[in-house]
Amino acid sequence: MAAGLNVSFGQDSVMDPVGPMNTGDVLDVAHMAVHAGHLSGRDEIRACFQAVTENPARNLGLEGYGLDVGCNADLVVLQASDPIEAIRLRPTRLHVIRRGKVIAESPPHTAKLDLPGRPASTEFVRSTQPPE
């Protein structure tokens, strides 16, 4: 990654002898890479997010992927404020969009709290971005 290579992460197996703990979730793959690779810097964590999103499409030579005008509009909206939170929290997928059409939705995850003098709920998501 530091050398400028287009690195991609993925997994081919789900709940089989090769990967009995694999879920098929690329955010789990990125989460494992952060831990196993000791990639704990903010830029390194962002690079792990790219390694499960943009980079695989680039490595496969797929066109029409990304957030540019004219792309396929295939995306997942996460309950996270940034890529670092997406990997840290492995959040709810609020919307799955394919070719511009919502094909799956989930309600936001909220934890209810019963603590006197404190908020009644939390999403464990930052409301503001930390300084760089």
Segments from the language model and where they lie:
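Active-site microenvironment of metallo-dependent hydrolases
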Residues: 49-132
